[in-house]
UniProtKB/Swiss-Prot annotation:
HAMAP family xrefs: DadA (MF_01202)
Protein name: D-amino acid dehydrogenase
Lineage of producing organism: Bacteria, Pseudomonadati, Pseudomonadota, Betaproteobacteria, Burkholderiales
Coiled coil: none
Gene assigned in the entry: dadA
Family in the record: Belongs to the DadA oxidoreductase family.
UniProt xrefs under Pfam families: DAO
InterPro entries: DadA, FAD-dep_OxRdtase, FAD/NAD-bd_sf
Binding site for FAD: 3-17
Length: 429
């Protein structure tokens, strides 16, 4: 089967790789000059299945109001007056109940755990290198309330059989020795030893090279204008003056998927803006050894070989990718507070990206009402964590195979009752 994958971020490239491995003839199209040059470029570097949690959680609406008046708040909202933004936020609020949180987190952990297994198998088969580490994730708490609040997440972890360790302040240094110097600031931590880290851009670039060896064709610097219909199927994708034809099409365009699919399949994927800095390590003893998640600031601090990546924030501001200096200050404050002297933040690079977020936090992977159109988008802050599993699952679905995990609640069909749009795009073949 000839398949066109639209998008060459980590989700698009993993989709292409697993489809090619399943025997399909795959072409990847992207407007950028190479793979992983947008959202996958400088993310937090975490592969954290156990921390796969929706932003829509009990208590978040009240916290959001408080965060509006805090300088270093993890969430910021700027209303733009669009119906889509307001509808998306309303849908997110509806998912902030305890029952919805449990359902959403459960399926996110299911996909993320499977994805880590797929990544480990891929690494064993190919030997792919991406400055990866397998030291686990450590979530640190600064208040007793945060420490006690971990109970609801632990319940989900137990149900999913995810190993965990609840640590006292004195025990934190067992996982991250440099935290011994600041243990007096912390009330404890939750460690997930099965989590991993790695440079997502490096992984995506090298996997694209492996995919090329399997016959995948990459077309960069190519405009992706519209899908062309022929009857009730997709005939091709309009790229400038050219119509690229195939048997099936995969939309993996991240935050741009919603607009691209407008008039065909209406999906609630909104751009959630995040930031990161990447600093060189200057003192090995004061640097992290794996990845640390600061519960107060919702910031991840991740160790690469000779760099520290610090990423976080969530801004509901549309497609604005401007770099706000106040956000850099928060990232620097967090890493310098927990790992003082570990990295030189004065020499750090500063980046922002748009994570494709659904209201329930779960990505949209699988079939659509259009027979030969498939989606792999909406992974939010967990595109790196869920990429391999999503790619393998999609390849199985498109190949007519039974996926290794429950997948019916991951497709767009869970939203069709409330967000289904028209059946035809603007362009027809």
């Amino acid at each position: 089967m000839r398949v066109v994958v639209l998008g060459s971020g980590v989700v698009g490239v993993t989709s292409a790789y697993y489809l090619a491995r399943a025997g399909h003839e795959v072409t990847v199209i992207d407007r950028e000059a190479g793979p992983a040059l947008e959202t996958s470029f400088a993310n937090a570097g975490q592969i954290s299945p156990g921390y796969a949690s929706p932003w829509a959680a009990p208590g978040v609406p009240l916290k959001a109001v408080k965060w509006m008046f805090q300088k270093h708040a993890p969430l910021a909202i700027r209303l733009d007056g669009t119906q889509f933004q307001l509808q998306w936020m309303w849908q997110m609020l509806q998912n902030c109940t305890s029952s919805r949180y449990a359902v959403n987190k459960g399926r996110m952990v299911r996909l993320a755990e499977y994805s880590r297994d797929c990544l480990q198998a891929l690494r064993a088969e190919t030997g792919i290198q991406y400055e990866g580490r397998t030291g686990g994730t450590l979530q640190v708490f600064r208040t007793q309330q945060q420490f006690e609040g971990a109970a609801k997440d632990i319940a989900v972890l137990r149900e999913a059989s995810v190993p965990y360790e609840l640590l006292s302040p004195a025990e934190l240094a067992q996982a991250e020795p440099a935290l011994a110097a600041v243990s007096h600031k912390l009330t404890g931590g939750l460690r997930l030893p099965g989590d991993e880290t790695g440079d997502c851009q490096m992984f995506t670039t090298r996997l694209a090279a492996l995919a090329e060896q399997l016959g995948v064709k990459f077309r960069y610097n190519t405009p992706i204008d519209a899908l062309a219909m022929a009857g009730d199927r997709i005939a091709g994708v309009k790229c400038g003056e050219e119509l690229v034809r195939a048997d099936s099409f995969v939309v993996a365009l991240g935050s741009y998927s919603t607009q691209f699919l407008s008039g065909l399949v209406k999906i609630p994927v909104y751009p959630l803006k995040g930031y990161s800095i990447t600093a060189p390590i200057v003192n090995e003893a004061s640097a992290p050894v794996s990845t640390v998640l600061d519960e107060t600031y919702k910031i991840a601090i991740t160790r690469f070989d000779d760099r520290i990546r610090v990423g976080g924030m969530a801004e509901i501001v549309g497609f604005d990718k401007s770099l706000r200096e106040a956000r850099r200050e928060t990232l620097e404050l967090c890493v310098n507070d927990l790992f003082p002297g570990g990295g030189d933040t004065s020499k750090a690079t500063f980046w922002s990206g748009l994570r494709p977020m659904t209201p329930d936090g779960t990505p949209i992977v699988g079939r659509t009402p259009v027979a030969n159109l498939f989606l792999n988008t909406g992974h939010g802050t967990l595109g790196w964590t869920m990429s391999c599993g999503s790619g393998q699952l999609l390849a199985d679905v498109m190949s007519g195979k039974q996926p290794a995990i429950k997948a019916d609640d991951l497709s767009v069909h869970r939203y069709l009752g409330e967000t289904r749009g028209a059946h035809r795009p603007a362009y027809a073949a």
